[in-house]
Amino acid sequence: MNWDEQMLWEGIDRMEKGIEVMCVSEYGKKFSVCGVESEVIDYSVSHPGPSEISRKTWEYARKKGHKVWAKIQLNNSWECSAVPFIPVFPLQAEHLNALSSLHIENYMLSWTLGGYPSPLLSLVNFCKGGKCDLEGWLKAECGEEAERIRAATEQFAAAFRNYPFSVEVLYK
């Protein structure tokens, strides 16, 4: 994006009140994997948002009377883009819970990668308007296999949180 905070605030100040403000939720989120410091440049499933700059932007936009949106990839991201969705449900629920705690109710979902109609679309609907009850969703979605799927996806999520994806390292 390459805009500093001052440029963001100035842009929002110049918008008419009917214009809605959308941020990539994870943009700029800082993280460390195996001692390598990095930050999210685009989207991330392994490092759930929102980032500090997205939080500040939504807060500023709301103060100025704008409706706000979170742009998120839930199914997958460039971290692992060749699959329809990544079954790391605890990370996806963590992201939705963080957005819910900020009263973010509007999303642009999985718009570029992983547009596959995965179970994650029902997770968003299940979590709308409150705390994301992952276990309740798994029971509704998976029936008697819910506990086994929960255990597996917790392991996947723990591993994926340590996935060494860094655009800065990748393209140097």
What is the role of each PLM region?
Residues 1-172:
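Substrate-binding groove of N-acetylhexosamine-processing glycoside hydrolases
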